[in-house]
Amino acid sequence: MATEAHAQPPALARVAIVTGAARGLGLDIAGRLLRDGMAVFMADVDEGVSDAASWLGTGAFAADCDVRDAGQVDSLVQTTVTRLGRLDLFVANAGVGGGGPIADMSDEGYRQIVGVNLDGAFFSCRAAARAMIPAGAGSIVTLGSIFGRDTPAGAGVYGATKAGVIALTHALARELGPYGIRVNCVSPGNMATEMHWTALRRRSAAAGVPFELVVEEVRADIPLGRHGTGTDVAAIVSFLASDDAAYVTGQTINVDGGYQPI
């Protein structure tokens, strides 16, 4: 795992790791945590993570990490603790989309989705727990999805991985609570991200209708009348990482504009 450091953060700053941080929700989460005063290790397989960390500036560190590889995730955490002295927050954000009829799903496509979304979340939580248990404190935030609770046709594998992330979160909150570690899940809804637009393009092609029409149909089903943004998700992660959430653990919080009331 290669790392690239930028300006050192202030001494004793809280330290976070965000996976999948080169773009999309992960980049917005990393930016918010930096503004909150945290030092952030931004991890991704995307080479653009170095440019992203440079763009965010002071306190941002770039790291190459494939979350499907347990050894790389362990190394990411070890490097973070060695260089910055602590780990206060791990945001297991890395994820991929993908879907289609189950009869058409290849073994490789299945393994890719499960490997990143579920294996990656497990390896991340395990590595974070191993670092946080001796410290007697910490916060882990996983990224689920509203489709982990109610999964549409054609998204079975994706939904199954996110349901697994939600279940893992709830179990780890019970398991790690006695060590002072909080574990929560943020479940985005229909977000204005490339992953979501790609899914809608597949839907558009399958139905033979214009992409713009599909986008409007989805938007019409959101009570707040708009797609979500990375800023919306990052705000909830920021809260869960803060002392204001000191008594919040084992929760799955939808960020979906009311699309899936629970």
Question: How would you name each of these model-derived features?
Answer:
Residues 36-51:
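Conserved glycine-rich Rossmann-like NAD(P)H-binding loop of the short-chain dehydrogenase/reductase
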Residues 91, 177, 182, 248-250:
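Short, small/polar-rich loop/turn modules that mediate ligand/substrate recognition or access, typified
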Residues 101-102, 109-114, 218-219:
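Substrate-binding pocket helix/loop in short-chain dehydrogenase/reductase
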Residues 122-125, 133, 224-255, 260-261:
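C-terminal substrate-recognition "lid" of short-chain dehydrogenase/reductases
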Residues 125, 161, 169:
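Active-site helix of classical SDR
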Residues 130, 174-178, 246:
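Alpha-helical segment proximal to the catalytic Tyr-Lys
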Residues 145:
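Residue(s) in the substrate-gating loop at a strand-loop-helix junction
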